[in-house]
Amino acid sequence: SLILSVGRLTDAKDYPNLLKALLELPERYKLVIIGEGEARNEVERTILNYGLEKRVKLLGSIANVATYYSACDIYVSSSKWEGFGLVVAEAMSCQRLVVATNAGGVAEVVGDMNYIVPVSDPQLLANKINEVMEFDHETKMEVMYRNREFVLKM
């Protein structure tokens, strides 16, 4: 199962929270992070400290992120604070499952509090990712379609 997260590598995006959540998830979960920033060294250190180097890929900055949205099973935003949540809207417009922390305007973008968890709670984040990934195929398709429709109406 492929988890995608896109955003600058900064304290605000709280990647350590997402990495800690990944520790709670089964081995089959892999994480790809797209973005560059001043917290890259901290993120790399955290990956090594948690022994996640086989499960996490840092891809740096990438121009066309849409193909990555389409390739992932779920998009996760683990921010402590956030503005509008544009990348969440992009993921939803690509018909992806989305789980996000309740930071800034993200909850409004997602539009369904069932997919929102409190900030800085890796256990709840992991539980929600697992819950959504365990949906049956039909439910996943329904949610992904609804995500796209919701964003297109914004």
PLM feature segments, named:
Residues 44-60:
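Nucleotide-activated donor-binding/catalytic signature segment of Leloir-type glycosyltransferases, i.e.
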Residues 89-90, 103-116:
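Short acidic/histidine- and often glycine-rich active-site loop of Leloir-type glycosyltransferases
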Residues 137-154:
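A charged, aromatic-enriched C-terminal amphipathic alpha-helix characteristic of glycosyltransferases
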Residues 97-100:
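Short hydrophobic beta-strand element within catalytic cores of glycosyltransferases
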Residues 61, 80:
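Aromatic "clamp/platform" in nucleotide-sugar-dependent glycosyltransferases that forms part
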Residues 66, 73, 95:
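A short alpha->beta transition loop at the rim of the catalytic pocket in nucleotide-sugar-dependent
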